[in-house]
Amino acid sequence: MKFYSSHPMPESLAAAIAVPLLGLLPAAQAASTAVQLPSVTVEGEYSSYQPESAQSPKFTAPLADTPRTVQVIPERLIQDQGASDLEAVLRNAPGISMTAGEGGRPASDLPFIRGQNSASSLFVDGLRDPSTQSRDTFNLEQVDVVKGPDSVFSGRGGAGGSINLVTKTPRNQDFTEVQAGIGTAETYRGTIDGNWVLGENTALRLNLLGTRDTVPGRDKAVEFSRVGIAPSLRLGLSGPTRVTLGLYHYRHRRVPDYSIPYDPRTGTPITETIGVSRRNFYGLVRRDSGDTEDYAATVKWEHDLANGFKVENLARYSRATVEQITTMPELKTADLAKGLVYRNLRASYQVNDSFANRTDLRGTFDTGQWRHTFDLGGEFATSRRSRDRYKQEIPDAASPCSPVTDGNNPALCASLRDPDPHVDFPGTVRRNHNPARYHTDILSLYGFDTIAFDEQWQLNLGLRWDHYKTSGRNLPVRGAKPPVYERAARTDNLFNYQLGLVYKPRPDGSVYASYGTASTPSAVSDYAPADSISGTSQQLKPERSEAIEIGTKWQVLDRRLLVTGAMFRETRKNTSIEVAEGLRAPAGKSRVTGMELGVAGSLTPRWDVYGGYALLDSKLVRASHKSGAQGQPLPSAPRHAFSIWSTYKLLPELTVGAGAFYRSKVYGNADAGYNKDGTPKARWVPAYWRFDAMAAYQLNKHLTAQLNVYNLLDKTYYAKTYRSHYAALGPGRSAMLTFKLSY
């Protein structure tokens, strides 16, 4: 998109004032109009590090005029960083932490946004994605992150915000890009992105993926492979009616890794306390396995109506299967004294079938002197989920790490300092074939309107109603014959809204205040994307969240650079806590107060930058009657988080870049109490810095070589925390050389 400015700025001057601009000084911007200079028009392109808008039609204003924190992570940034999965992409979004899963889900994307669990708030092209997977980037065009309660956009859940993955679709031009990469740690990756125009109004796009990796800094037994294919066909490229058909298949096979156990004496990982090697892998190669497979079919229909109105309908069916048998390293104080780690089995088999359909009508109209930009829509979604357990049978397996056996069963009891993941596994692991089953239906209606009263004042409104109905039967009671199932059901009507006021002192700047809400039904799971319900949770009313945010956004340096800042307070109420022995009630409460700063775009035509900082002052205001968590920080809510990435074009053919990422101390749980043996209940990981770098050289018109180096200082850090048993190590230092062939 082209832009026009009457205030050009020399390249040297822009670089000199870059740092003060990051301080968000709109007053200085206003003062610059005191002297009248001859008007000169400068024409250029927005930086590809500064996306203009989010993908969803529910956003009825550009990002610079949207009265809340919305961060868009663009495709070029993902490519420059060599980010191959969603976890790496979200490293660019301060305020988001990934947590480790349980119940056989260590390899899935489980984000926390501003200290609130957002595992159920992941979307693909605006439709909720209930699958349990570690997502690859081979078919991503951008990632949109909404921060703060956003049920008005995303529906049920959304207490901390939501994440929308925007996929690649056909374009009106021919191109093919083939990438082949080889890296340290036996890493191989290949992708193909091709687009072909077929006739006047049809285009085909095809994205392919193949990768095989081990994990840098971990035992070579920890390996995985991914394959993916995503074809899409668009009919009516330039006509008033457009239809896009898309398919998606993705498979992720791996040896699962629960990483490093906590030291029960301190609550920190044993790599920090007794100096065990970060390469230690406590799993069993001959028992453990993980296999995730996802299918999706999408149909999008768009039609241009009169007066600039547009209508679109998006429908998608998806099926996700997860089979995971893994080791959770369990370390107790008595085992620690003997130098033993219990190889505790964690396994599950899950199948999730879902269908969603969304229809939107959007456009612009005037009422007197007021300009309305609106979106009206409705959505229906249904999902069915099953979850089964496994049973392990091993001769003489009782108390494998007790003094009775003295750790003589190495299949279940590993050496703390020198575990052998290749020992024989003498037993069997079989699925029970008595799954829990859940069924959820949601009907939604919503409306959004941005009202421009004049060139300076805008009002942003949003309203949503969700009819939420869920039912299910839980896993059978252990040992009961015949099987005894607990059945439960609940129906809720959820109303959510947002209100935002925007003042634009200049066309390239805005100041805003906003209020928004979210509703989280009791069946929304903390550690899974899909819903589940129990006899206890069916009695509980939905949690409520609300947020107040004030902020400012400025497009500076001839609109090449977007600089943002915001302060907020978010409150979550009605969380389920134990108020008396055996009695739960929606009486819990938590609060997060904080601020965010962001920068995205170009300092000069050669110098791009993307970064941000988040301060989260979180507190569990009201907790369980016997918990030591009250008054403590929330889990997965680091007080400080910072990221910065920058590239510079040294020569027309050569681009170099580097990035820094910081996260302060993070808790896996919020409990400040002590166990009966005097050991702390709290689990936490220390702060860390991580540094990455890249260089790309265009060898000729069609071929480019790019080198990425990750974790330059080979820092031992922890990318994910879990509330009780373990923390997941981040990868060690590695490098990847990728050749890109484009034509």
Swiss-Prot record:
A motif (TonB C-terminal box) lies at residues 726-743. Residues 62-168 form the TBDR plug domain. Residues 173-743 form the TBDR beta-barrel domain. Residues 1-30 form the signal peptide. It is found in: Cell outer membrane. Belongs to the TonB-dependent receptor family. This is Probable TonB-dependent receptor BfrD. The lineage of its organism: Bacteria, Pseudomonadati, Pseudomonadota, Betaproteobacteria, Burkholderiales.
